[in-house]
C-alpha cells in the first residue's frame, strides 16, 4: 500500500529521537533517500512529513505561482526554507530538530497521523483537540465527497 494510514503514539527520547512507524517506513521504502523530509505545517500546529516525490509535487505546484508574488515567496520560505531531511537510523528512528519540536509543542511523546500522501507528527493532546474539530467538519461536509471512477 502506498498511503500513510492510522495513528500511532511513540516516545521521544532525550536526544530527540523518535521511531517512525514501520508501515510508514514501508511506504517510503521506494524513495531514493532513506529517510523523510519534514517541515512545519502551514495549516496546523504540527510537523508535515513526506518523501522526496511529494516535495517534487509541491515544488511543481509552487512554480505555477508568479515568481515575484508574496504567496510564492511565503510558500517557498515556509516549505523549502524550513524543510529538513531526516535520515533513518538502524532502528527506524529520526532525530527531530528542536525548531520543529517547538513548532508542534512536542516534548516526550509524538503522535503520528497518516494523511494519505503525507503524515503529520503532533503533540498527542493537541491532536486529540484537532480530531474533535476535524470530526465536526467531516460530519458537516460529508456530502461533498464524490466517487471517483
Swiss-Prot record:
Pfam families: MraZ. InterPro entries: MraZ, MraZ_C, MraZ_dom, MraZ_N, MraZ_sf, SpoVT-AbrB_dom, SpoVT-AbrB_sf. Residues 7-54, 83-126 form the SpoVT-AbrB domain. Its main location: cytoplasm. The keyword Cytoplasm applies. It comes from the Bacteria. Keywords: Cytoplasm, DNA-binding, Repeat, Transcription, Transcription regulation. GO terms for molecular function: DNA-binding transcription factor activity; transcription cis-regulatory region binding. Signal peptide: none annotated. One of its GO terms (biological process) is negative regulation of DNA-templated transcription initiation. GO terms for cellular component: cytoplasm; nucleoid. Gene3D superfamilies: Transcriptional regulator MraZ domain. Coiled coil: none annotated. It is found in: Cytoplasm, Nucleoid. Forms oligomers. Belongs to the MraZ family. This is Transcriptional regulator MraZ. It comes from Rickettsia typhi (strain ATCC VR-144 / Wilmington).
Amino acid at each position: 500500500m502506498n498511503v500513510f494510514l492510522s495513528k500511532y503514539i511513540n516516545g521521544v527520547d532525550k536526544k530527540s529521537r523518535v521511531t517512525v512507524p514501520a508501515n510508514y517506513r514501508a511506504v517510503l521504502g521506494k524513495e531514493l533517500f532513506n529517510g523523510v523530509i519534514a517541515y512545519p505545517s502551514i495549516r496546523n500546529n504540527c510537523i508535515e512529513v513526506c518523501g522526496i516525490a511529494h516535495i517534487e509535487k509541491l515544488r511543481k505546484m509552487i512554480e505555477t505561482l508568479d515568481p515575484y508574488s508574496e504567496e510564492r515567496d511565503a510558500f517557498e520560505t515556509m516549505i523549502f526554507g524550513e524543510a529538513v531531511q531526516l535520515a533513518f537510523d538502524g532502528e527506524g528512528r529520526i532525530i527531530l530538530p528542536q525548531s520543529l519540536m517547538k513548532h508542534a509543542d512536542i516534548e516526550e511523546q509524538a503522535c503520528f497521523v497518516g494523511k494519505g500522501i503525507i503524515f503529520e507528527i503532533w503533540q498527542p493532546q493537541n491532536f486529540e483537540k484537532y480530531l474533535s474539530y476535524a470530526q465536526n467538519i467531516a460530519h458537516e461536509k460529508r456530502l461533498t465527497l464524490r466517487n471517483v471512477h
